[in-house]
Amino acid sequence: MKLWNNENEARDQIKKLVREYYLQFKANKEEFFDRERIAYAKRVYDENEMCALTDAMLDFWLTTGRFAKQFEHDFSKWIGVRYAHLVNSGSSANLIAFMVLTSSELGERRIRRGDEVITVACGFPTTIAPIIQYGAVPVFVDVSVPQYNIDVTKLEKAYSTKTKAVRIAHTLGNPFDIEAVKKFCDKYNLWLIEDNCDSLGSEYEINGEKRYTGTWGDIGTSSFYPPHHMTMGEGGCVYTNNSMLDKLILTYRDWGRDCICVSGQDNFCGHRFEGKYGELPEGYDHKYVYSHFGYNLKVTDMQAAIG
């Protein structure tokens, strides 16, 4: 005997039960009491996230899919950038943000082994780790107290002819002095990577223009780990307004593949078998050309649904 007339009816009933489950067993209906400890960070969700997760689970599309595509579109529109790409963690976002700047496609501006990157002396390891991993040299600048953000008066002293980039995080929702840092980067033609994992939604104003943190530099990164402002459980995002960096972000995220056509759509660009790549024979399938060392750092659609 069939329980439902069609799949849509089944999904609606299942999600209705999930909603009722949340309201009965998960919703916090108790008032805070005097002297109760309030967590500075924790997961925050309601029946909407649980229903979206249920929807993705019923799709059973286990890798990046429609929910990820929708999130990337909505997130980029909200934060105010042209391109945003989900990854499996904020640490992966930080890794990719640095990896793309080592690409030979960037010419003289690429970061090579031995080049220097100015960063903050007080921060999280994954802001620093990719610098060391790719053979560059971190140049540490101290923080100011009580802001615990980079002391911009010490930037000039940290600069040398080997400096290629500045990579720093906004601390606990408090933006660093973006105006001073950006002027410094513009003066010396340096890349600026904003680690925005702790500060999603913070705003900063320069000359009357107000923007979200993470959008003033060349690349911004966010983390969606449970203690952050928005959660997927695990997840992160890399975003930029630079079309070349956007292509490289996709390449490094998707195994180092040169082709950035939409996954699951055959010959989306219309030039899959028309190119000549290195020493490969002419007409070699572009979908299987790998121009960079990369990783599989995509997010699952179930995580994206929670976001």
Where are these regions (language model features)?
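Active-site phosphate-binding strand-loop segment of PLP-dependent enzymes
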Residues: 146-247
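Active-site region of PLP-dependent enzymes
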Residues: 198-206, 216-307
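A short beta-strand submotif of the Rossmann-like class I SAM-dependent methyltransferase core
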Residues: 86, 119, 165-168
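N-terminal "arm"/small-domain region of PLP-dependent enzymes with the aminotransferase-like
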Residues: 1-62, 291
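Short beta-strand->loop structural element characteristic of the AMP-binding/adenylate-forming
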Residues: 137-147
